[in-house]
Amino acid sequence: MKKTAVIVFSGGQDSTTCLIHALPLYDEVHCITFDYGQRHHAEIETAQRLSKQLGATVHKVLDASLLNELAISSLTRDNIPVPTVNSSGESLPSTFVPGRNILFLTLASIYAYQVKAETVITGVCETDFSGYPDCRDEFVKALNKALELGMEYKLRLETPLMWLNKAETWALADYHNQLELVREQTLTCYNGIMGSGCANCDACNLRAKGLNAYLENKTQVMDSLKSKMGLK
């Protein structure tokens, strides 16, 4: 029986690592990128390029522009500054887009239903993240149950990075011999700068700290990754 997965794909470090990891595990991997009026259109262009370069079966860009009207965030509004690493903390940073993962995972699951995919993959992570509530394991499990009930369809929301720290996420890219591609060709920066980014926003800070931690202790981090994910 053909195994098919759908990936919520932004062209950033996490979703690209998920794509790299999924490709040898599934017969078909479909990438879904959402155009929600995000601050930097380069995100969509990067996702299109990487999905083709890495060999995804299908890549679709879906219009989710309604989210831009409803969700006010520094990632959807040019007049709201992206916070720096040293910004004093609110309970949620201004980069949080309320409802984004709810909407994206729901739409990806509807697409999965149509193509008879059994898995929807997302790169959310509870270990190293910016405090977003929709990156938590309990949220994903609750939404998974709701989607199965609402569509009467057996579906798994898979989160391969959920319990990895950023160093281990870098190790996973290296495990698949794609460390340099992820390092140089993905777009994680909230200010829209490719690769290492601006070095000033929270996304770049997490990414750089994780990479440094991995490069300083590759063997130990790789062993930890293999233990967590059951890799050989």
Curated annotation (Swiss-Prot):
CDD domains: QueC-like. Keywords: ATP-binding, Ligase, Metal-binding, Nucleotide-binding, Queuosine biosynthesis, Zinc. Zn(2+) binds at residues 189, 198, 201, 204. InterPro entries: QueC (IPR018317), Rossmann-like_a/b/a_fold (IPR014729). PANTHER family: 7-CYANO-7-DEAZAGUANINE SYNTHASE. Pfam families: QueC. One of its GO terms (biological process) is queuosine biosynthetic process. Transmembrane segments: none annotated. It catalyses: 7-carboxy-7-deazaguanine + NH4(+) + ATP = 7-cyano-7-deazaguanine + ADP + phosphate + H2O + H(+). One of its GO terms (molecular function) is zinc ion binding. Pathway: Purine metabolism; 7-cyano-7-deazaguanine biosynthesis. Its EC number is 6.3.4.20. ATP binds at residues 9-19. It comes from the Bacteria. Binds 1 zinc ion per subunit. Its cofactor is Zn(2+). The keyword Coiled coil does not apply. This is 7-cyano-7-deazaguanine synthase 2. Belongs to the QueC family. The keyword Metal-binding applies. Gene3D superfamilies: HUPs. Catalyzes the ATP-dependent conversion of 7-carboxy-7-deazaguanine (CDG) to 7-cyano-7-deazaguanine (preQ(0)).
